[in-house]
């Protein structure tokens, strides 16, 4: 339990697939309900830099953010086939889609980032590790709503 552990956010690893890209990098993973798990990244001096941290947002909101930045962007991830048409119709800045061979998670990118983050001291123990969920699951939302309704009915009784 005291072994060192390096946490690698999924969208960071996906962005790292486009090592040394000159454009902004926008990984998009389909989160259902017109939302994506995403972030905005760039490479500076061969280093992945987070422009906007990972988040779960409606794809329309992400398009607005990217239009406001006014920079070229490259998209990758399983959200590309889902939201490609929406991007084509609404994005006003130059954009492209990553080639198929780097469009999905790759163990090599996770390992490379693990080495970098480890050298930077971004290490925790297994006991300290807490998964970071960007959105509450549907089951958790429904359970919370049910508990809230039960409390309300108890107050009214």
State where each predicted segment sits.
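Acyltransferase
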Residues: 96-157
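Surface "functional belts" at beta-alpha junctions
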Residues: 3-104
């Amino acid at each position: 339990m005291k072994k060192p552990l390096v946490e690698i956010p999924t969208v960071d690893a996906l962005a790292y697939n486009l090592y040394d890209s000159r454009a902004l990098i926008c990984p998009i993973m389909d989160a259902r309900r017109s939302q994506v798990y995403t972030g905005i990244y760039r490479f500076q001096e061969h280093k992945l830099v987070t422009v906007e941290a990972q988040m779960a947002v409606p794809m329309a909101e992400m398009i607005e953010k990217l239009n406001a930045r006014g920079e070229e962007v490259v998209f990758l991830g399983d959200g590309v086939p889902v939201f490609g048409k929406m991007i084509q119709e609404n994005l006003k800045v130059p954009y492209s889609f990553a080639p198929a061979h780097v469009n999905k998670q790759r163990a090599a990118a996770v390992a490379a980032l693990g080495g970098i983050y480890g050298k930077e001291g971004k290490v925790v123990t297994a006991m300290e590790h807490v998964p970071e969920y960007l959105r509450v699951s549907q089951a958790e939302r429904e359970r919370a709503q049910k508990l809230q309704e039960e409390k309300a009915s108890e107050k009214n009784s």
